[in-house]
A protein has these predicted regions:
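Short, charged recognition helix plus adjacent turn
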Residues: 71-100, 104
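A short, Lys/Arg-rich alpha-helix, primarily the initiator
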Residues: 1-21
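DNA major-groove recognition helix of helix-turn-helix/homeodomain DNA-binding modules
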Residues: 33, 53-68
Length: 404
């Protein structure tokens, strides 16, 4: 039996068992933590299920032996090897740099140098250059720990602000690289440093980073609790028109839209997008407060992501056609292009999907090649195009190649 035949057989089996249990597609989607569009595509044989963990979740929800579903679907092994930069970033979090700083009595590096390196850390994060980021942080984090203990008291708050921003960059990169545990540690350290700096907005920025960890780990209840409470705390400053608070509140509200989309709640998702759009309109373009990149263009990017998650490919592609990404980072542009590829995939437009993925890869090669969603999407595209084109085959090879 060919792979497409397996997909169709599995889809029919799932549909039969779902109806046998008296479940609707939305009910099954909630039980397996997926979108209604995903369930529909699986049942129609459009989307491939090739991960044992997903089959296990479906079997449990449908109350059937796993063997009955596994017999219908060939499960492929996950890509081995570690994304570039991931190991180095984990080592940054593992070093006993605070202890060394307490004991060795070194002089503090110049604050100007620490400021420059912290800005560079975020430049590398926005560019998706994670190997270079890990190399930079291996020196920057120990220097910040030393400075926190060696600078005069009146400079200490700024050092902790730089430390918070550095750990936020580390968390953002690790979340993109599929390292939720390490990303959580980095986000927690960022919030602790922001607290020691006495900077509530920087604490909110740390919460914003933590939410990405929760979303990637599918801990939507924790993600919603963090976004809701942080946004509520910022509301008075938003009402006063404080740009930094507006950016953070807007970023958190966009995250709430994504969470609602994952939970298949379109009314809430689009409602949150509308609220964020209103604040973005007041704020205007050209802001990157706390590296949120919040503004009208970023709201449109999230509209694309939400629409794709809800299975509304048409809305996603219309939004993509209208967005101006010239002012956004390479990382954000690549993320949007992956969502555009997903929308084309939902319409079985393989050539357009591959073109979007290649553009995304050109923007941030490390991020795209290490992204599990991109690998799954490419696998799906391979089953749609028979035989697959040269560009798609070459992309698949790059995604499954073991990192150097």
């Amino acid at each position: 039996m060919t792979t497409p035949d397996y997909q169709k057989a599995l889809g029919r089996k799932i549909a039969v068992e779902r109806r046998r249990r008296g479940l609707s597609q939305p009910e099954l989607a909630r039980m397996v933590d997926r979108s209604v569009a995903w369930v529909s595509q699986v049942e129609r044989g459009v989307r491939k299920v090739d991960r044992m963990s997903v089959l296990e979740a479906l079997a449990a929800a449908l109350d059937v032996p796993l063997a009955e579903l596994a017999a219908e679907a060939p499960v492929v092994a996950a890509v081995t090897g570690e994304p570039p930069g991931a190991g180095g970033l984990r080592l940054v979090l593992s070093g006993a740099y605070a202890l060394r700083a307490m004991l060795d009595g070194r002089r503090a590096p110049a604050l100007s140098t620490l400021r420059t390196k912290t800005r560079k850390a975020w430049e590398l994060t926005h560019a998706g250059r994670y190997t270079e980021l890990s190399e930079l942080l291996r020196g920057l984090v120990p220097d910040l720990e030393t400075a926190a203990r060696a600078v005069p008291e009146d400079q200490r708050a700024e050092v902790f602000e730089l430390m918070a921003a550095t750990y936020q960059a580390c968390s953002a990169a690790l979340a993109k690289l599929g390292e939720p545990d390490a990303a959580w540690i980095a986000a927690d350290r960022a919030m602790a440093a922001a607290d020691r700096a006495g900077n509530p907005l920087l604490v909110a920025a740390g919460a914003f980073r933590l939410v990405f960890v929760f979303i990637n780990a599918r801990r939507y209840d924790q993600a919603e609790e963090t976004t809701r409470t942080a946004a509520e705390a910022l509301q008075p400053m938003v009402n006063q028109g404080t740009p930094q608070a507006m950016s953070l509140w807007g970023g958190l509200t966009l995250q709430r839209a994504v969470i609602a989309a994952h939970l298949n709640d379109p009314d809430t998702a689009y409602g949150q997008l509308e609220q964020a759009s209103q604040v973005a309109g007041r704020l205007g373009e050209g802001h990157n407060e706390y590296n949120t990149e919040f503004g009208p263009a970023n709201v449109r990017l999230y509209e694309i992501a939400v629409a794709v998650e809800l299975g509304d490919a048409g809305r996603a592609l219309r939004a993509a056609a209208a967005v101006d990404t010239s002012g956004l980072s390479a990382e954000r542009r690549a993320r949007m292009l992956v969502d555009v590829a997903r929308a084309h995939s939902q319409r079985r437009q393989v050539r357009e999907a591959v073109a979007a993925l290649l553009q995304a890869e050109a923007n941030t090669p490390e991020q795209v090649r290490s992204h599990s969603l991109v690998r799954q999407l490419t696998s799906d595209l391979l089953t749609m195009q028979d035989p697959p084109g040269a560009e798609l085959r070459d992309l698949s090879k790059r995604l499954t190649a073991k990192p150097d």
